[in-house]
């Protein structure tokens, strides 16, 4: 009974516009009673309506994972290869341009580009010139396209190999034509989790520092969480708390850029390396867990990060559509191709036609609208 009263009080506070404390967030995630979960869902849906409106947005974009050759060995990753391995690939400029050309022809406003950390991706012994060449290859041909490219991990990789400051790398990428930074490589922003999941990746403080630097330098970022593996409810809320604090800094300090959206990425373990797969004990995400976490994320972050999305690649289109009544206001993008999650064994597919996304949204009786990367309306 006490818990029921506690949940009601927490949800009441959220509906009054207050930010939840970490303890309150954990209480919501711990709920298992259908009645409590239904109340959390309803609150997240009301807050979504208040903070983001009823319009469901989507983006026409293409994903380009330009190489899967990677120096790191994250315990969840089925995408990476060593150079010379079966299935290793590294796209050249012509192949990247071909994909970009196809994307523009199909109406894309955004190209999302990320890849493995390939130490050979250099020009004259330096990494940054290689990355700048990739950017310039696309921007010279298609100056109008928005490049959403290179995660905080890739920024650290370039800076480390070339002996540069993170800010120098971000400025160079920005000036070459990168329009925003994916908030990936966050996984869970908890160093205890990271030691098991991705011990070679940047630590929590470095990820937060690089993203905050991007905001200071006028580069908007997204934010993500890889959920449903070894992390606890406390660690999930700790992650959301760090993102909220990061966004509060960007807004309160008057930085020229900030976090544009929060994307939940439920863990897909089907093809993941065996030790983690065994530990997690399942191959596909549990939809009910992802929906509850997404609803709590809306309640926890929504005052500061109003745009929320769940991944149809990971949850399937039906799951991502259902998430639209669990706090989400965006259904994501067309992608056109996607390798990282698909190689992990996801069943959601890699390409979604605009009409399919529209039909899914319309099935809920909600209006839809094409947007760009920064959530500005696109007249389609």
Swiss-Prot record:
CDD domains: Radical_SAM. One of its GO terms (molecular function) is 7,8-didemethyl-8-hydroxy-5-deazariboflavin synthase activity. Its cofactor is [4Fe-4S] cluster. It catalyses: 5-amino-6-(D-ribitylamino)uracil + L-tyrosine + S-adenosyl-L-methionine = 5-amino-5-(4-hydroxybenzyl)-6-(D-ribitylimino)-5,6-dihydrouracil + 2-iminoacetate + 5'-deoxyadenosine + L-methionine + H(+). Disulfide bonds: none annotated. The keyword Transferase applies. Pathway: Cofactor biosynthesis; coenzyme F0 biosynthesis. Keywords: 4Fe-4S, Iron, Iron-sulfur, Metal-binding, S-adenosyl-L-methionine, Transferase. Binds 1 [4Fe-4S] cluster. The cluster is coordinated with 3 cysteines and an exchangeable S-adenosyl-L-methionine. Residues 56-303 form the Radical SAM core domain. [4Fe-4S] cluster binds at residues 70, 74, 77. Catalyzes the radical-mediated synthesis of 5-amino-5-(4-hydroxybenzyl)-6-(D-ribitylimino)-5,6-dihydrouracil from 5-amino-6-(D-ribitylamino)uracil and L-tyrosine. This is 5-amino-6-(D-ribitylamino)uracil--L-tyrosine 4-hydroxyphenyl transferase. It comes from Nostoc punctiforme (strain ATCC 29133 / PCC 73102). The gene is cofH.
């Amino acid at each position: 009974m006490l818990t029921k009263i506690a949940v009601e009080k927490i949800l009441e506070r959220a509906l009054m516009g207050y930010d939840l404390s970490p303890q309150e967030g954990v209480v919501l995630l711990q709920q298992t009673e259908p009645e409590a979960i239904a109340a959390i869902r309803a609150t997240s849906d009301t807050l979504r309506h208040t903070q983001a409106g009823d319009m469901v947005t989507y983006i026409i974009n293409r994903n380009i994972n330009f190489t899967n050759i990677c120096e790191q060995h994250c315990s969840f990753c089925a995408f990476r290869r060593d150079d010379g391995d079966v299935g290793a690939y590294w796209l050249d400029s012509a192949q990247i341009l071909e994909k970009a050309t196809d994307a523009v022809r199909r109406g894309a406003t955004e190209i999302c580009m990320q890849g493995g950390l390939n130490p050979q991706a250099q020009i004259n012994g330096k990494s940054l010139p290689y990355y700048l060449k990739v950017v310039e290859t696309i921007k010279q041909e298609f100056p109008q396209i928005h490049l959403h490219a290179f995660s905080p991990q890739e920024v650290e990789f370039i800076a480390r190999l070339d002996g540069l400051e993170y800010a120098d790398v971000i400025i160079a990428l920005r000036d070459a034509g990168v329009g925003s930074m994916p908030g990936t490589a966050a996984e869970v922003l908890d160093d205890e989790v990271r030691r098991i999941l991705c011990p070679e990746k940047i630590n929590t403080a470095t990820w937060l520092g690089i993203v905050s630097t991007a905001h200071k330098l006028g580069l908007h970022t997204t934010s993500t969480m890889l959920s449903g593996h070894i992390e606890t409810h406390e660690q999930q809320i700790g992650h959301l708390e760090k993102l909220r604090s990061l966004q509060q800094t960007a807004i309160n300090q008057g930085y020229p850029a900030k976090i544009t959206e929060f994307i939940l990425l439920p863990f897909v373990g089907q093809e993941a390396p065996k030790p983690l797969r065994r530990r997690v004990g399942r191959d596909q995400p549990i939809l009910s867990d992802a929906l509850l976490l997404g609803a709590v994320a809306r309640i926890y972050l929504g005052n500061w990060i109003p745009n929320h999305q769940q991944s149809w690649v990971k949850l399937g289109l039906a799951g991502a559509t259902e998430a639209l009544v669990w706090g989400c206001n965006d259904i994501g993008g067309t992608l056109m191709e996607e390798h990282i999650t698909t190689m992990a064994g996801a069943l959601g597919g890699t390409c979604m036609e605009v009409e399919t996304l529209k039909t899914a949204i319309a099935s809920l009786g909600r209006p839809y609208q094409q947007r760009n990367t920064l959530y500005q309306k696109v007249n389609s």
